[in-house]
């Protein structure tokens, strides 16, 4: 994975003609909680100059191009984040940025970076290219954090009513644990660590589902694919909803 991060940062810098303020990582990679099959490689890249239309078009499908060139590499497709101009990021007003997400990618002039990402960047962001200073990432205020937790809670209530046989279904349990930790301590931690904390502090009334979710998440990287194909696991996942 480290080699893939280096290759990706080099490619982004090259497309931007080296006019890169910096690239920062956050999320599971920074928390040493990256789990293949569960996790993304979250990043933000900020340029020193305006991104041209040609550069944006070249950056748009960079993940796919690198994946096609190295079909056995599972990491390039997992990069998620934005590539934008630093000044525009600070003003929260964009003329053009490139967004890579789970469901696709796009060139846009409008994007709201979620509170949890901003929180992680401000406190735990790791520079991997260019500027070493994370002070440009402002820590969200308590009201913003409370609002984000409430919004995420509503999302869970909406989409976890009917779970499916994917591992993401039990991932909701870890999200809940993480949100409760954030409310209590005004901080962010890794999903696995949040699950362990919730068990140790008996946060959940019924701890059995969380224990099983942690068992799956903590399995070696080659094991999740086995869990995905097991009928008992798939049945359990689909029955997790209320």
Which residues fall in each region the model found?
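Helical scaffold of the NTase/Pol beta-like nucleotidyltransferase catalytic core
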Residues: 1-24, 54-57, 242
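Residues that form or immediately flank small-molecule/cofactor binding pockets and catalytic motifs
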Residues: 28, 83-88, 215-218
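Conserved nucleotidyltransferase catalytic core and NTase-mimicking acidic/glycine-rich helix/loop elements
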Residues: 120-242
